Amino acid sequence: MSKRHNSADFLSILKKHGITKLYHFTDRDNLDSIVANGGLYSWADCEDRSIAIPKPGGSNSSRILDARYGLQHYVRLSFTPKHPMMFVAMNDGRISNPIILEVDLDVILDETTKFSDRNATKNGAYIGDDIEAFKCIHFNSLKADTHFDLAPEEQMFFQAEILVKNHVPLSAIKNLASFGISLSKSAVKRASRIPSTAQISRQTPTAFIFLVDHSVSMERMI
């Protein structure tokens, strides 16, 4: 990782707003592949590496939009474990047993990481890779429990994104132990295989293992 020269400025903003981790939602059935391949890859990098995704969170239309805007090689992370697109993916049947992976803030400090003030493929999204782009994120809106708690004109900013180039390594995923996975210096070991189920709805949005992708794109609004 090529670390930013002004990393302290980014960390200061995160500390000011009480942000300690990032999140990525995926399906429980994808976890074995994530571990076996050493972390989270963008869907395009998965294709390049012939990595099969058992239950992809993104739709075909979202992939088309990603490619159109040059975002296909980025892993999407969010600031919330209750990402609206997780529920969309569930309703569409793409995922059925969602889990949330928690990701270390250090990925923000990589010079290749980009930031978007809303879903990166949505009309009007401000995307950049510097401190000014980072400051455009509506951090106060991220403090809401869900996007429904925000005014309609502010709800889009609840989906602010961290776009990590190509790959989030296993070492950056902080809650693997919650899934019975332990990391050693030389290998990732499957400690146990404990089935987990989850029932998530708008009424019970937290009834799952809090472990964070977001990696689903919304269609660009015209």
Show the residue positions of the predicted features.
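Active-site-proximal loop/hinge segments that shape catalytic or ion-binding/gating pockets
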Residues: 1-76, 82-187, 191, 199-201
